[in-house]
Amino acid sequence: MVSKELSKEQRQKRIQDIIARESISTQGELVQRLRADNIQVTQATISRDINELRLVRLPIGKGRHRYALAQMTGHTDVEEELGRLFQNFVHDVDRGENMLVIRTADGHATGVALLLDRLRRDDIVGTLAGEDTIFVVARTTLEAESLMEEFHALMLG
């Protein structure tokens, strides 16, 4: 069978379709699933696609997770989900001047950062997320102190 050559947009649309219909837990599973459809991809490409699509990893029980499309629309939905993620996956919050570092369980930093970005708060200049660490830049030192208190409260529930 011949491999399909898809544009980036077509490939990402296909990823969204698969994620919406199937339980995909890892990048490797997603690579295998696409290859089963004769779409040749590398894990590096899938990693970039996951970041660009801002997919989040949701717990599905027994220590397992699945990728999902972040589809929260209302401010309240975002705040509730952020609280849940902080309670379940954020381990530590630290601050230096107007910068905060949030440490999460492996694989959860991008999901938390996405929700922080979706809040569109004036006191947050921006976020940068890796696998288990989020860098948050607050507008001022005072606002960073306030954010740190708020994040600690979210961790406690």
Curated annotation (Swiss-Prot):
Pathway: Amino-acid biosynthesis; L-arginine biosynthesis [regulation]
GO molecular function terms listed in the Swiss-Prot or TrEMBL record: arginine binding; DNA binding; DNA-binding transcription factor activity
Main location: cytoplasm
InterPro entries documented for this protein: Arg_repress, Arg_repress_C, Arg_repress_C_sf, Arg_repress_DNA-bd, WH-like_DNA-bd_sf, WH_DNA-bd_sf
GO process terms (BP): L-arginine biosynthetic process; protein complex oligomerization; regulation of arginine biosynthetic process
Subcellular location: Cytoplasm
A Pfam short name: Arg_repressor_C
GO cellular component: cytoplasm
UniProt keyword terms in alphabetical order: Amino-acid biosynthesis, Arginine biosynthesis, Cytoplasm, DNA-binding, Repressor, Transcription, Transcription regulation
Gene3D superfamilies: 3.30.1360.40, Winged helix-like DNA-binding domain superfamily/Winged helix DNA-binding domain
Family label: Belongs to the ArgR family.
General function of this protein: Regulates arginine biosynthesis genes.
NCBIfam families assigned to the protein according to its UniProt record, in alphabetical order: argR_whole
The name this protein goes by in its record: Arginine repressor
Organism: Deinococcus deserti (strain DSM 17065 / CIP 109153 / LMG 22923 / VCD115)
Lineage: Bacteria, Thermotogati, Deinococcota, Deinococci, Deinococcales
Gene: argR
